Amino acid sequence: MRSMKAIIEYLLKQALINLQQSGEMPIDLEIEIKVENAKDPAHGDYATNLALVLAKPCRQAPKVLAERLVAVIPADPSVEKIEIAGAGFINFFMRSTARSLIISEILNKGKEFGQGNLGQSQKVLIEFVSANPTGPLHVGHGRGAAFGATLGNVLKAAGYDVTLEYYVNDAGRQMNILAVSVWLRYLELAGEPIAFPANGYKGQYVYEIAQEMWSEQGNQFVHPWISVVDNLPADEPEGGDKETYIDAIIARAQSLLGKDGFANFHQHALKTVLDDIKDDLQAFGVRFDSWFSEQSLFEDGSIGKGIQALKDRGHTYEREGALWFRATDFGDEKDRVLVRANGQTTYFASDVAYHWNKYDRGFDRVIDIFGADHHGYVTRIKTAVKALGHDESALDVILVQFAILYRGGDRVQMSTRSGSFVTLRELREEVGNDAARYFYVARKPEQHMDFDLDLAKSESSDNPVYYIQYAHARICSVLRQLKERGLKWDKDMGLKNLDLLEQQHEATLISLIARYPEVIQSAAASCEPHQLAYYLRELANGLHSYYNAIQLLCEQEQLRCARLCLLESVRQVLNNGLAILGVSAPESM
């Protein structure tokens, strides 16, 4: 069944064709027809500014165009009347029977209501979170996790074939810093008088991993501290450079431990942290289809294949012993190094190989979700994709601003390297998964987010997730009261008497639930899950107003059954929408 908005868009398109065929409008017009929900019931159910958009290319007054369009709009049983308002807006009033049909559709489709075919089974890969496996996820990662998972659910509901992927950065410098941090804490447990590097990872989890290594391996990897720091450059507290020092101590650890010994610390730290990340995300309701290892790009030759693909297309050159990508040819501010003069590939080379691999796996569309601190990566990734011969429009890069926590009006500080961060797990334990999942997606991803912990825990109408869940629970309580009072809900009787739903609150609710499929399609088309969060709050508000104003379990059986059909439809839509957001729909609160 087509949505009412889709019906109106079709009618307007036919009206345009009619005017073009009669010579009253240019044939070569390329106009996007936009239909909006009317903000005021007095202006109908839907409205369009099509006549105003056509005024300039057609060189006619908007109101005259509106009159001509309305005159040739085909008749449709769903439409009661059409009016022209203001400078040329066209307002559509739908028949109550058309609105009521949506109730029958919802009750028949249940959990499948709202699912569409916008995506036409296109294969989409969404990569998100992808935090370095160097420590627990913090609350900033949580926003990206909630956004990516919800976007995946929205796209699935809109008919896309979605794969969710976490890119594991297990081959870079940060992992070496973690490995050496664990080793140094291991030496400390052995009684060595270490001085911990300014640039090392200092969290409690580093101690815990070191303790595991000490318990399992004993002292076989112990070396005297003096041999570790002999002839090393000064660290930052002694006036040196912390980056130079940490690189030097990594090299010393690799030399003393050997390849296998250092790999032992590297792999143990990686597995421990990655297992913790997986458990954390699983508990948050975020489930990935694929955990893609950066190291695998080296092992399966993807790094070389990605670089060779750029070479074959003539997009590389050599300078001072290094291999460069001609990024400026594709709009980047400067060319990028792929292979350094020492033969080491760069992070950018891994990015090229990873995206080459994504398209090589047959995905029609790729969505990268990065933290806002990665804004510098956007252009270089897009230039690489374009240089590899792929349509730039098949890549979407979405930047998600980190969340800022507030407790009691005061900002909560966090810092990963210092170990004093607030973890995602701590946030979930404090406010619950439901509040975290909703609050994280309630705003556009590019907008800064102030996460009010006190509000997220409050049981009031000011807390949007509580307000929405309470609407669902209220409907369930009505159904329980029905049984307690010995009354029956005859669904067939209710569906036959939907014309009895004459109250304005009922008309508002019916219009709201009819919009649900449109919200899903719009949220999917624009990659904006917050549209669904806003919509559910609006629907909950409509339900609460209805609940407070109307006697739902009235004596008149036909009306009571019709109202129960409406209530169950609202409950189903709330349930479906909350499921997409990753939020539970409690039956009692």
Swiss-Prot record:
GO cellular component term of the entry, any: cytoplasm
The protein's enzyme class: ligase
Catalytic activity: tRNA(Arg) + L-arginine + ATP = L-arginyl-tRNA(Arg) + AMP + diphosphate
Record's keyword terms, sorted: Aminoacyl-tRNA synthetase, ATP-binding, Cytoplasm, Ligase, Nucleotide-binding, Protein biosynthesis
NCBIfam families listed in its UniProt record: argS
Family: Belongs to the class-I aminoacyl-tRNA synthetase family.
InterPro entries associated with the record: aa-tRNA-synth_I_CS, Arg-tRNA-ligase, Arg-tRNA-synth_N, Arg-tRNA-synth_N_sf, ArgRS_core, DALR_anticod-bd, Rossmann-like_a/b/a_fold, tRNAsynth_Ia_anticodon-bd
CDD domains attached to this UniProt entry: ArgRS_core
The UniProt record lists the keyword Protein biosynthesis: yes
Native species: Legionella pneumophila (strain Lens)
Gene that encodes it: argS
Pfam families xrefs: Arg_tRNA_synt_N, DALR_1, tRNA-synt_1d
Compartment list: Cytoplasm
GO MF: arginine-tRNA ligase activity; ATP binding
Extent of motif 'HIGH' region: 131-141
Entry EC number(s): 6.1.1.19
Protein name stated in the entry: Arginine--tRNA ligase
